[in-house]
C-alpha cells in the first residue's frame, strides 16, 4: 500500500506543505518533524496530518439493482458516483453514511454493513485532501420509496448490478471500489 501512496504523492503535494505557520502560536518556525507531522520550534506544538473520513454506499435492492448518483459538481461532474461523502465532526462513520444517503437520495435506510476501506486523495478547491474512504453495503428490502436526487447529486438511478460498468464512475477511488465490490461478491 505504501507504493500506491508514494505514487499519489508524485501528483499531489503532501498536505503539510500548505501549512506554513503554527496554528497555536502563529510562528513561522513550523517545520517538518517527519512524514506525517510538523512541529513548532517556538511553542513545541506538533501537528499530525491525518486523513479525513469519507464514506460510500453500495445500496442494493431486492431486484439486485445498485443505486448510483450522477455527480452535479466537479470533480468528475456528470459521471456516476456512489452516494456518500465526508463525515462531519461529531459524527460516527455510520451516522455520516446515513446522513449522506438521506441528503443525496432522500432515502431513509436502517441497515448498513461495513465492507472495506482504502486511502484516497480527493481534489477540493485545488488542494489534494487525503481521505480514508470507508465503503458500506446498504441492503434495502421491499417497496423502496421514490428516490430524489439532491445535494451534490444531479440524478439518482437504479442499475442492475450485472450492468454496472466501473468505467462510468468518474472518481478513481470510487471506480476502484466498484471493481473491488464486483470482484469480492463475484458479480463479474
Residue ranges and their predicted role:
Residues 42-66, 86:
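Conserved N-terminal beta-strand and adjoining loop/helix that marks the start
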Residues 9-12, 61-103:
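Conserved Nudix-box catalytic region and its N-terminal flanking loop in Nudix hydrolases
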Amino acid at each position: 500500500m505504501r507504493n500506491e501512496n508514494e505514487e499519489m504523492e508524485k501528483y499531489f503535494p503532501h498536505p503539510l506543505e500548505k501549512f506554513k505557520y503554527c496554528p497555536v502560536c502563529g510562528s513561522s518556525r513550523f517545520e517538518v518533524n517527519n512524514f506525517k507531522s510538523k512541529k513548532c520550534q517556538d511553542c513545541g506544538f506538533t501537528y499530525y496530518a491525518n486523513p479525513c473520513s469519507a464514506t460510500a454506499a453500495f445500496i442494493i435492492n431486492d431486484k439486485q439493482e445498485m443505486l448510483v448518483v450522477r455527480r452535479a459538481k466537479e470533480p468528475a461532474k456528470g459521471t456516476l458516483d456512489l452516494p456518500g461523502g465526508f463525515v462531519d465532526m461529531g459524527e460516527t462513520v455510520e451516522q455520516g453514511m446515513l446522513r449522506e444517503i438521506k441528503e443525496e437520495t432522500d432515502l431513509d435506510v436502517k441497515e448498513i454493513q461495513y465492507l472495506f476501506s482504502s486511502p484516497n486523495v480527493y481534489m477540493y478547491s485545488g488542494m489534494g485532501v487525503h481521505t480514508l474512504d470507508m465503503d458500506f453495503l446498504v441492503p434495502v428490502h421491499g417497496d423502496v420509496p421514490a428516490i430524489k436526487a439532491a445535494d451534490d447529486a444531479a440524478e439518482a438511478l437504479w442499475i442492475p448490478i450485472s450492468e454496472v460498468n466501473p468505467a462510468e464512475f468518474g472518481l478513481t477511488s470510487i471506480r476502484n471500489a466498484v471493481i473491488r465490490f464486483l470482484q469480492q461478491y463475484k458479480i463479474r
